[in-house]
Amino acid sequence: MTRNEKSEVIAKLESEFKDAQAIVVCDYHGLSVKKLEALRNAAREQNVKVQVIKNTLANIALKNSAKDGMSLKDTNIYLWSEDQLAVTKVVVKFEEANSEFFKIKTAYIDGEVASVDKVKALSKMPSRDELIAMLLQVWNAPIQNFTIGLNALKEKKEQSA
């Protein structure tokens, strides 16, 4: 890779990392190409970007986008997105299915380096759409119970008449 190509890669990664709300770094040593493609497909469905990047290039891009502090060693695959929950859900689900070859190493979430435990905890949270559905269900419950009660009262009066 020439110096110009490296500069282009760093500039591209910088701009993408600046927009990313979450960046997760994982070890994928020993993962088959088929499994790696499955990860890429699952990530693509959630608008999560996946890329294997040299650590030196990733370090420069992270530092230039004000997201440094992660210690990067060995072979790494990077996943990032503007949606924190999407990244964590994809990564944790894939790690559970492929724990022998795929491990979460570190992450950058909410402006700070995050532990593996924080990534796993975040993945268990409901998404925005799920939270809205829960809220609507809570708001709808009293009205629904009221109408059920009125219908029961109506049927009782009809039977007694």
Curated annotation (Swiss-Prot):
Tree of life domain: Bacteria
Signal peptide residues on this chain, from the entry's feature table: none
Any single GO BP term: translation
Any single GO CC term annotated in Swiss-Prot or TrEMBL for this entry: large ribosomal subunit
GO molecular function (one): structural constituent of ribosome
Keyword Ribosomal protein: yes
InterPro entries on file: Ribosomal_uL10 (IPR001790), Ribosomal_uL10-like_sf (IPR043141), Ribosomal_uL10_bac (IPR022973), Ribosomal_uL10_bac_type (IPR047865), Ribosomal_uL10_CS_bac (IPR002363)
Keywords associated with the record: Ribonucleoprotein, Ribosomal protein, RNA-binding, rRNA-binding
Biological function: Forms part of the ribosomal stalk, playing a central role in the interaction of the ribosome with GTP-bound translation factors.
Family: Belongs to the universal ribosomal protein uL10 family.
Oligomer and partners: Part of the ribosomal stalk of the 50S ribosomal subunit. The N-terminus interacts with L11 and the large rRNA to form the base of the stalk. The C-terminus forms an elongated spine to which L12 dimers bind in a sequential fashion forming a multimeric L10(L12)X complex.
Protein name: Large ribosomal subunit protein uL10
Organism of provenance: Campylobacter curvus (strain 525.92)
Taxonomic lineage of the native organism: Bacteria, Pseudomonadati, Campylobacterota, Epsilonproteobacteria, Campylobacterales
Underlying gene: rplJ
